[in-house]
Protein backbone atom coordinates (compact mmCIF):
# COMPACT_ATOMS: atom_id res chain seq x y z
CA UNK A 1 0.00 0.00 0.00
CA UNK A 2 2.84 2.38 0.90
CA UNK A 3 4.53 1.76 -2.47
CA UNK A 4 1.28 2.46 -4.32
CA UNK A 5 0.82 5.75 -2.42
CA UNK A 6 4.41 6.72 -3.17
CA UNK A 7 3.86 5.89 -6.84
CA UNK A 8 0.72 8.07 -6.99
CA UNK A 9 2.57 10.96 -5.33
CA UNK A 10 5.42 10.65 -7.86
CA UNK A 11 2.94 10.45 -10.75
CA UNK A 12 1.06 13.56 -9.57
CA UNK A 13 4.33 15.52 -9.23
CA UNK A 14 5.43 14.42 -12.71
CA UNK A 15 2.12 15.46 -14.28
CA UNK A 16 2.26 18.84 -12.54
CA UNK A 17 5.83 19.49 -13.77
CA UNK A 18 4.85 18.35 -17.27
CA UNK A 19 1.87 20.72 -17.31
CA UNK A 20 4.10 23.60 -16.19
CA UNK A 21 6.62 22.95 -18.98
CA UNK A 22 3.85 22.51 -21.55
CA UNK A 23 2.36 25.90 -20.65
CA UNK A 24 5.80 27.53 -20.75
CA UNK A 25 6.60 25.97 -24.13
CA UNK A 26 3.32 27.34 -25.50
CA UNK A 27 4.24 30.82 -24.25
CA UNK A 28 7.70 30.52 -25.84
CA UNK A 29 6.17 29.46 -29.16
CA UNK A 30 3.65 32.31 -28.98
CA UNK A 31 6.46 34.80 -28.30
CA UNK A 32 8.49 33.47 -31.24
CA UNK A 33 5.43 33.41 -33.53
CA UNK A 34 4.58 37.04 -32.80
CA UNK A 35 8.06 38.07 -33.93
CA UNK A 36 8.38 35.58 -36.82
CA UNK A 37 7.72 38.21 -39.52
CA UNK A 38 10.81 40.23 -38.59
CA UNK A 39 13.03 37.83 -36.60
CA UNK A 40 14.43 34.35 -37.26
CA UNK A 41 14.93 31.95 -34.34
CA UNK A 42 18.47 30.58 -33.95
CA UNK A 43 19.29 27.74 -31.57
CA UNK A 44 22.81 26.65 -32.56
CA UNK A 45 26.22 28.08 -31.58
CA UNK A 46 24.79 30.57 -29.11
CA UNK A 47 27.00 32.78 -26.98
CA UNK A 48 25.29 35.77 -25.38
CA UNK A 49 25.94 37.59 -22.13
CA UNK A 50 27.27 35.71 -19.11
CA UNK A 51 24.44 35.22 -16.64
CA UNK A 52 26.75 34.39 -13.74
CA UNK A 53 25.52 31.83 -11.21
CA UNK A 54 22.18 31.34 -12.98
CA UNK A 55 23.98 29.40 -15.73
CA UNK A 56 25.14 26.85 -13.14
CA UNK A 57 21.62 26.10 -11.88
CA UNK A 58 19.84 22.87 -12.78
CA UNK A 59 16.21 23.89 -13.36
CA UNK A 60 13.45 21.48 -14.33
CA UNK A 61 13.40 23.07 -17.80
CA UNK A 62 15.56 25.60 -19.61
CA UNK A 63 16.03 26.88 -23.13
CA UNK A 64 18.25 29.41 -24.90
CA UNK A 65 17.55 30.91 -28.30
CA UNK A 66 18.52 33.97 -30.28
CA UNK A 67 16.15 36.14 -32.27
CA UNK A 68 17.98 37.60 -35.26
CA UNK A 69 16.44 40.27 -37.48
CA UNK A 70 15.80 39.17 -41.06
CA UNK A 71 16.73 42.61 -42.40
CA UNK A 72 19.88 44.59 -41.67
CA UNK A 73 19.72 47.96 -39.96
CA UNK A 74 22.22 50.40 -38.52
CA UNK A 75 23.52 49.93 -34.98
CA UNK A 76 24.91 52.60 -32.61
CA UNK A 77 28.34 52.36 -34.23
CA UNK A 78 26.98 53.11 -37.70
CA UNK A 79 27.43 49.53 -38.93
CA UNK A 80 24.84 47.72 -41.01
CA UNK A 81 23.99 44.59 -39.03
CA UNK A 82 21.19 42.20 -38.18
CA UNK A 83 19.83 43.21 -34.78
CA UNK A 84 19.53 40.35 -32.31
CA UNK A 85 18.48 39.40 -28.80
CA UNK A 86 19.35 36.36 -26.69
CA UNK A 87 16.53 34.89 -24.62
CA UNK A 88 17.05 32.33 -21.87
CA UNK A 89 14.20 30.79 -19.94
CA UNK A 90 14.65 28.84 -16.70
CA UNK A 91 11.73 27.03 -15.08
CA UNK A 92 12.15 25.60 -11.60
CA UNK A 93 10.09 22.82 -10.07
CA UNK A 94 9.01 24.79 -7.01
CA UNK A 95 9.01 28.36 -5.74
CA UNK A 96 11.57 27.31 -3.12
CA UNK A 97 13.91 26.13 -5.90
CA UNK A 98 13.51 29.48 -7.66
CA UNK A 99 14.16 31.39 -4.43
CA UNK A 100 17.35 29.42 -3.80
CA UNK A 101 18.48 30.08 -7.39
CA UNK A 102 17.82 33.82 -6.89
CA UNK A 103 19.72 33.75 -3.60
CA UNK A 104 22.77 32.32 -5.43
CA UNK A 105 22.29 34.59 -8.48
CA UNK A 106 22.18 37.97 -6.70
CA UNK A 107 25.88 37.92 -5.61
CA UNK A 108 26.91 36.55 -9.04
CA UNK A 109 24.47 38.30 -11.39
CA UNK A 110 24.85 39.21 -15.07
CA UNK A 111 28.54 39.43 -15.98
CA UNK A 112 29.38 38.40 -12.38
CA UNK A 113 28.17 41.65 -10.77
CA UNK A 114 26.77 41.80 -7.24
CA UNK A 115 23.13 42.92 -7.06
CA UNK A 116 21.19 43.65 -3.90
CA UNK A 117 17.53 42.61 -4.03
CA UNK A 118 15.21 45.62 -4.38
CA UNK A 119 18.06 48.13 -4.70
CA UNK A 120 18.77 50.00 -7.93
CA UNK A 121 22.37 50.53 -9.05
CA UNK A 122 23.80 53.37 -11.15
CA UNK A 123 26.24 51.08 -12.94
CA UNK A 124 26.72 47.39 -13.63
CA UNK A 125 30.24 47.05 -15.08
CA UNK A 126 30.55 45.15 -18.38
CA UNK A 127 26.82 44.25 -18.43
CA UNK A 128 24.87 44.51 -21.67
CA UNK A 129 21.30 45.85 -21.76
CA UNK A 130 19.07 43.19 -20.21
CA UNK A 131 15.51 42.50 -19.08
CA UNK A 132 14.78 39.90 -16.40
CA UNK A 133 11.20 38.76 -15.75
CA UNK A 134 10.62 36.58 -12.68
CA UNK A 135 7.13 35.11 -12.55
CA UNK A 136 6.00 32.14 -10.50
CA UNK A 137 8.70 29.49 -10.92
CA UNK A 138 10.14 30.96 -14.13
CA UNK A 139 13.03 33.34 -14.80
CA UNK A 140 13.22 34.80 -18.31
CA UNK A 141 16.29 36.81 -19.34
CA UNK A 142 16.67 38.85 -22.53
CA UNK A 143 20.06 40.38 -23.36
CA UNK A 144 20.95 42.74 -26.20
CA UNK A 145 24.38 43.67 -27.57
CA UNK A 146 25.51 47.02 -26.22
CA UNK A 147 26.03 48.41 -29.73
CA UNK A 148 22.35 47.75 -30.53
CA UNK A 149 20.76 49.46 -27.51
CA UNK A 150 18.03 51.96 -28.31
CA UNK A 151 15.59 52.95 -25.55
CA UNK A 152 12.35 52.68 -27.58
CA UNK A 153 13.30 49.26 -28.96
CA UNK A 154 14.28 48.20 -25.41
CA UNK A 155 10.84 49.23 -24.13
CA UNK A 156 9.19 47.23 -26.92
CA UNK A 157 11.19 44.14 -25.90
CA UNK A 158 10.13 44.69 -22.27
CA UNK A 159 6.46 44.90 -23.24
CA UNK A 160 6.67 41.71 -25.31
CA UNK A 161 8.54 39.80 -22.58
CA UNK A 162 6.11 40.80 -19.84
CA UNK A 163 3.16 39.94 -22.10
CA UNK A 164 4.33 36.36 -22.66
CA UNK A 165 6.40 35.59 -19.56
CA UNK A 166 5.03 37.96 -16.90
CA UNK A 167 1.93 38.62 -14.90
CA UNK A 168 0.53 41.03 -12.33
CA UNK A 169 2.85 39.74 -9.61
CA UNK A 170 6.00 39.28 -11.69
CA UNK A 171 9.25 41.01 -10.73
CA UNK A 172 11.06 42.90 -13.51
CA UNK A 173 14.74 43.90 -13.39
CA UNK A 174 16.24 46.00 -16.18
CA UNK A 175 19.78 46.92 -17.13
CA UNK A 176 18.74 50.01 -19.09
CA UNK A 177 21.79 50.58 -21.21
CA UNK A 178 25.43 49.63 -21.55
CA UNK A 179 26.77 48.97 -18.04
CA UNK A 180 23.58 50.16 -16.37
CA UNK A 181 21.74 51.57 -14.65
CA UNK A 182 20.14 48.52 -13.05
CA UNK A 183 16.52 49.21 -12.06
CA UNK A 184 13.90 47.08 -10.32
CA UNK A 185 11.01 48.39 -12.44
CA UNK A 186 8.12 46.19 -11.28
CA UNK A 187 7.28 44.59 -7.92
CA UNK A 188 10.73 45.11 -6.44
CA UNK A 189 11.23 43.06 -3.28
CA UNK A 190 11.61 44.87 0.02
CA UNK A 191 15.37 45.37 0.53
CA UNK A 192 14.88 44.09 4.10
CA UNK A 193 13.33 40.81 2.88
CA UNK A 194 15.87 37.99 3.32
CA UNK A 195 14.33 35.61 0.74
CA UNK A 196 16.89 36.37 -1.99
CA UNK A 197 19.79 37.37 0.29
How should each PLM-predicted stretch be described?
Residues 6-9, 17-86, 91-197:
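Soluble, non-membrane globular domain cores that form compact, hydrophobic packing
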Residues 1-4:
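Positively charged n-region of N-terminal signal peptides that target proteins for export
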Amino acid sequence: MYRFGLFLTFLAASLSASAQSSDLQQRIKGFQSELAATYAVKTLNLQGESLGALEKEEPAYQTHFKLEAKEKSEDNLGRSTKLNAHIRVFEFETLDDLNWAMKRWMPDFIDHNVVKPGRDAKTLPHADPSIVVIDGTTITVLTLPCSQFELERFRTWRKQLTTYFGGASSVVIEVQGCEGPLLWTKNAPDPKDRTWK
